[in-house]
Amino acid sequence: MWKKKKVKAGVLLYAVTIAAIFSLLLQFYLNRQVAHYQDYALNKEKLVAFAMAKRTKDKVEQESGEQFFNLGQVSYQNKKTGLVTRVRTDKSQYEFLFPSVKIKEEKRDKKEEVATDSSEKVEKKKSEEKPEKKENS
């Protein structure tokens, strides 16, 4: 009988040791998963903030101003050193620096010039085609 008790205690000690090792491995794995998810959520938030800042950079119309998005708001200032954008979300605030941007009004003027030039070319072609038709008749 004395030997049977030792065997039972040995099996119980082995089972507790294996359970403790499994528990430690499970805890390590779960901590890795939680850290991975937190890192993913932070990177996603930074990416969304950068996308808002980039969109604001493309739509700059004044020297400074604000734009509002569903996920936050962006304030910007166009300085000599560059375009400073501050993105405020529900959870945090980010700041991005871009090269200085020309104001959009200048871009519009260029587009108008191009449109005017192309319409003038079309008018010239039409006026050149009319005399040719008269000569053929």
Swiss-Prot record:
The keyword Nucleotidyltransferase does not apply. Its main location: other. InterPro entries: ComGG_streptococcus-type. One of its GO terms (biological process) is establishment of competence for transformation. It is a single-pass membrane protein. It comes from Streptococcus pneumoniae (strain ATCC BAA-255 / R6). This is Competence protein ComGG. GO terms for cellular component: pilus; plasma membrane. Keywords: Cell membrane, Competence, Fimbrium, Membrane, Transmembrane, Transmembrane helix. The keyword Cell membrane applies. Residues 106-137 are annotated as: Disordered. Required for formation of the type IV-like pilus (T4P) that plays a role in transformation. Transformation pili are dynamically extended and retracted, perhaps thereby promoting DNA uptake and transformation. Required for transformation. It is found in: Fimbrium; Cell membrane. The chain crosses the membrane at residues 10-30. The transformation pili are flexible filaments, consisting mainly of the major pilin ComGC and smaller amounts of the minor pilins, including at least ComGD, ComGF and ComGG, and perhaps ComGE. Interacts with ComGC; the interaction is probably direct. Interacts with ComGD. Interacts with ComGE. Interacts with ComGF. May act as a link between ComGC, ComGD and ComGF.
